[in-house]
């Protein structure tokens, strides 16, 4: 059955991002919809377990939090097989190469090979983008059955990313 406190703990972890790498207790509570007391208990638990560090005012994830995502990646040998092929492709086209999976209506990058260019996008493993906005996402959505695609599309309204975003 559903364990609400566990779900809240995951929400606290997910509240940290490139935009909010360190946060006060109030910021975590606000971003997660938790009370300050609830957010504090979860942060202190995560700190005791080594997933979060705090200096008395700000909290931040520790490298140990990578273990959570690495468990998925290491359990999927496909990504280990894909990386050499992606490296060859990236070298031949002189562009970065990514592999991703659908997570609802988002794509999550699970492997990425960067090229060395002056200008590049800041997408790494774990980056999440709406599938509808990206070519990779549209390819993955196209592989779904019509019923599954319609069910997913009903869960979230589509928004144009730019004025050029195709909305069909």
Spell out what each predicted region is:
Residues 1-80:
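N-terminal helix-turn-helix
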Residues 149-150, 158-168:
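Short, intrinsically disordered, charge-balanced linker/junction segments flanking boundaries
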Residues 58-156:
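Amphipathic alpha-helical effector-binding/dimerization core
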Residues 16, 70, 137, 160-164:
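Conserved short-loop catalytic and cofactor-binding motifs
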